[in-house]
């Protein structure tokens, strides 16, 4: 594994750990100002503006969600939901070191639990990453669920 592949892999693993630990403000800081977080409904969906999505949020909406999750008066999250990511080894799909642009895809199982309810999701996370200075940042995080076209309850946290 070369240095950049190792760095990209560690970034993906660190991001999942932040989510599992509930470090949402720190996680939000990984995103560029023009970032998007997208969970399409259908496999192969190419345009979030022309099709329905389970979630399509810019950084402002992500920030509002993070603030809500951090608030003491978020009664729908008392007690708080918890999550766990089980990741397959991330695969680098495209790498342009000169431009500082990378695409990494990771298969995952994700468990979200609150009280006595546990929900399992499975799918693939595709990260479009860019370098800003010496930092990697997320420009787009796309989550393709195996059953994205199924009926879902609330997805409380972030995959």
Give names to the regions the model predicted.
Residues 1-33:
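Short, low-complexity N-terminal intrinsically disordered segments enriched in polar/charged residues
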Residues 3, 50, 117:
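Conserved aromatic-histidine-acidic binding/catalytic patches
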Residues 6-10, 60, 120:
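A generic "alpha-helical surface" signal
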Residues 12, 41, 108:
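Short, histidine-centered active-site or binding-site loop motifs used for metal coordination
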Residues 15-17, 73-80, 114-116:
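Short helix-to-loop capping/linker segments positioned immediately adjacent to catalytic or ligand/cofactor-binding
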Residues 33-104:
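A solvent-exposed, acidic/Ser-Thr-rich amphipathic alpha-helical stretch
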Residues 84, 91-159:
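A beta-strand edge to alpha-helix "cap/lid" segment located at domain peripheries
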